[in-house]
Swiss-Prot record:
Residues 164-237 are annotated as: Winged helix-like DNA-binding region. The keyword Electron transport does not apply. PROSITE patterns: NUDIX. Disruption phenotype: Deletion of the gene leads to a 150-fold increase of the basal level of nadV expression. Involved in the transcriptional regulation of the nondeamidating salvage pathway for production of NAD from nicotinamide. Represses expression of the prs-nadV-nrtR operon by binding to the DNA region located upstream of the operon, thus blocking the nondeamidating pathway. Disulfide bonds: none annotated. InterPro entries: NrtR_WHD, NUDIX_hydrolase-like_dom_sf, NUDIX_hydrolase_dom, WH-like_DNA-bd_sf, WH_DNA-bd_sf. Keywords: DNA-binding, Repressor, Transcription, Transcription regulation. This is ADPR responsive transcriptional repressor NtrR. One of its GO terms (molecular function) is DNA binding. Pfam families: NrtR_WHD, NUDIX.
């Protein structure tokens, strides 16, 4: 039979409270950092330098530091910078995963984030990071990744794929000036299927997400109009999801 102790105040209760009296899970963050290069969707992986699962490829991440990290987002930015040399301006929480089997060290919880970053803008920092490397998503999903990172990667890609269908997030990969054909190509690489050209152009222009400039570039045999991003936030939501082309079959 347990004895209930009556405390005179919350302050008195907290004064005697010992966190070590209660078992706590391991607490980590993991990041799925996507980009596009050479016509393929890429994912940033790191090679683990310590046990457990030493030398396995994994998503960048690490333990929450109770002294340094004011919140989970701060931890995600800190670990990403430590492991890869980059600090993504955009990180979005995808899911929290916890169980007794995902980490051999014990009961573990991780908070999964994803980001979509410009490949060229961050490549120099990543090249100076000894254990990080860009891998195509197709290659990464064939690897025996550390812990449950194969499942985490699939969850993060599902979120990216879904957000591509209703937000302007892929425009963050574009240079300051671009053609609508170039932008459509980025969307198609992430989605994995073709889009109807007229519908895509109408969507981008009528929503006000892009605006014409007074410049053009030669594309094929004729000049193509150059556009720029017209909003402040890449997480702009379109009123409708992108539709599959008519010949697409599920």
């Amino acid at each position: 039979m347990s004895l209930r102790v009556n405390f005179s105040s919350e302050q008195a209760f907290l004064a005697q409270y010992q966190k070590s009296d209660y078992p706590s899970p391991l607490m980590t963050v993991d990041m799925a950092i996507f980009s596009v290069d050479q016509g393929q969707l890429q994912i940033l992986l790191i090679q683990r330098s310590n046990y457990p699962q030493k030398s396995y490829w994994a998503l960048p991440g690490g333990f929450v530091d109770l002294e340094q990290d004011q919140n989970l987002m701060a931890c995600a930015h800190r670990k990403l910078l430590e492991k890869t040399g980059i600090d993504s301006p955009y990180l979005e929480q995808v899911a929290s995963i916890g169980n007794a089997k995902r980490d051999p060290r014990g009961w573990s919880v991780t908070v999964l984030y994803f980001a979509l970053i410009n490949f060229k803008a961050y490549q120099q920092q990543i090249q100076h990071s000894e254990h990080s490397e860009w891998v195509t998503l197709e290659q990464a999903l064939k690897l025996d990744l550390a812990f449950d990172h194969h499942d985490l990667l699939q969850q993060a890609f599902a979120r990216l794929n879904n957000k591509t269908r209703y937000t302007a997030l892929p425009i963050s990969l574009m240079p300051p000036l671009f053609t609508l054909t170039e932008l459509q190509n980025i969307y198609e690489i992430i989605l994995g299927h073709n889009l109807e050209k007229k519908a895509f152009r109408r969507r981008m222009i009528e929503s006000g997400v892009v605006e014409e400039t007074d410049q053009s570039k030669i594309a094929g045999k004729r000049p193509a109009q150059l556009y720029r991003f017209a909003l402040q936030d890449y997480d702009f939501n379109f009123p409708r999801m992108l539709e599959y082309p008519r010949h697409h079959e599920d």
